[in-house]
Amino acid sequence: MAGSGCAWGAEPPRFLEAFGRLWQVQSRLGSGSSASVYRVRCCGTPGSPPGALKQFLPPGTTGAAASAAEYGFRKERAALEQLQGHRNIVTLYGVFTIHFSPNVPSRCLLLELLDVSVSELLVYSSHQGCSMWMIQHCARDVLEALAFLHHEGYVHADLKPRNILWSAENECFKLIDFGLSFKEGNQDVKYIQTDGYRAPEAELQNCLAQAGLQSDTECTSAVDLWSLGIILLEMFSGMKLKHTVRSQEWKANSSAIIDHIFASKAVVNAAIPAYHLRDLIKSMLHDDPSRRIPAEMALCSPFFSIPFAPHIEDLVMLPTPVLRLLNVLDDDYLENEDEYEDVVEDVKEECQKYGPVVSLLVPKENPGRGQVFVEYANAGDSKAAQKLLTGRMFDGKFVVATFYPLSAYKRGYLYQTLL
């Protein structure tokens, strides 16, 4: 959906009008060579979720950079408009144009605002690696997105940890940034993918382009599987692998290096059955793109049949609409009905300070005995509550607040998390 144009000065204003509504620009989330992203909120609509405004052609951009920004905008808009509706691809709310001057239009995409990126998760889990639950969750979500966009004929062409973000509302990972995407068989971008996540055939193509030469073949959707394989290997190992994948040792025998990484982790945690993940990653990292497993087939891997449980760190890092409070109720409250009802009412009253509470559950038996599960109307309220309740004193005890998967909560599945 396209909106009307509006005028901006050299710096973004606090408020702008688009789609017949007033939007508050709250903060800058990030910027690149051709675009900046801002957090925005619709004014006059209480409870409406914030959005992400991606503004192409920042102030002062001219010449080739301006042309690149316009081109990137058109490519990303076209891809997102065709790929809308899939739960693992960022939602495009609308498109509009702003003007720094009458002759300098700046294109904008209004997108859903997502949460933590896989890049940030890798920083948190540096050297120890992500949990198998998180790796499995991310792998499945990204493969679902890739299977869909490949079926639609698209290649993402810039899959990397920074372009995979968590959605607190939908409780899944989503792909963003389709500025380098192209239709398979019609590659109109010379340089694709990011160093460290670039498939061998894309590396060759980029080198030829730098030398002014043209490759005989175009890249295919297989480049996305290569990138995902590297991402999953980094999540498992807790290490950045940019230099590893460029080494002669990797080129000579990447399979042996993958085996070594998995063998090293197996010594630390022998109870985790990781060989299915190892085999899945290997199937994505064949040098020959024709041998790489397609996304749809990868979803059938035995790795996805293993019921992993999240670590407590996962439930702190990945927001959801459900909050779990630990260290609130002891056995005395659970065994006395009057005291139990009083303390549950006190907890509910406290939690409602941060937003409407849809439901509240305090199991008297395991699993989940004595834990408090609070379902909020939206993840924004849950995040605010988690931030402010963590470390608070309740009945002389420090409260520990984590998130909890909404899907598991709805099914009544209160599993024991791993420490």
UniProtKB/Swiss-Prot annotation:
GO MF terms, alphabetically ordered: ATP binding; enzyme binding; protein serine kinase activity; protein serine/threonine kinase activity; ribonucleoprotein complex binding; RNA binding; splicing factor binding
Pfam families found in the cross-reference section: Pkinase (PF00069), RRM_1 (PF00076)
Domain RRM: 324-406
Binding residue positions for ATP: 29-37, 54
Keywords from the named record: ATP-binding, Cytoplasm, Kinase, Nucleotide-binding, Nucleus, RNA-binding, Serine/threonine-protein kinase, Transferase
GO cellular component: axon; cytoplasm; dendrite cytoplasm; neuronal ribonucleoprotein granule; nucleus
Gene3D superfamilies, sorted: 3.30.70.330, Phosphorylase Kinase, domain 1 (3.30.200.20), Transferase(Phosphotransferase) domain 1 (1.10.510.10)
Tissue expression from the record: In the embryo, preferentially expressed in the developing nervous system.
The keyword rRNA-binding belongs to this UniProt entry's keyword annotation: no
Enzyme Commission designation: 2.7.11.1
Broad EC category: transferase
SMART domains reported in the protein's UniProt record: RRM, S_TKc
Active site: 141, 158
UniProt catalytic activity: L-seryl-[protein] + ATP = O-phospho-L-seryl-[protein] + ADP + H(+); L-threonyl-[protein] + ATP = O-phospho-L-threonyl-[protein] + ADP + H(+)
Subcellular localization, as worded in the UniProt entry: Cytoplasm; Nucleus
Cited InterPro entries: Kinase-like_dom_sf, Nucleotide-bd_a/b_plait_sf, Prot_kinase_dom, RBD_domain_sf, RRM_dom, UHMK1, UHMK1_RRM
Principal location listed in the UniProt entry: cytoplasm
UniProt family annotation: Belongs to the protein kinase superfamily. Ser/Thr protein kinase family.
PANTHER family for the chain: SERINE/THREONINE-PROTEIN KINASE KIST, SERINE_THREONINE-PROTEIN KINASE KIST
Function: Upon serum stimulation, phosphorylates CDKN1B/p27Kip1, thus controlling CDKN1B subcellular location and cell cycle progression in G1 phase. May be involved in trafficking and/or processing of RNA.
UniProt protein name: Serine/threonine-protein kinase Kist
Species this protein is from: Rattus norvegicus
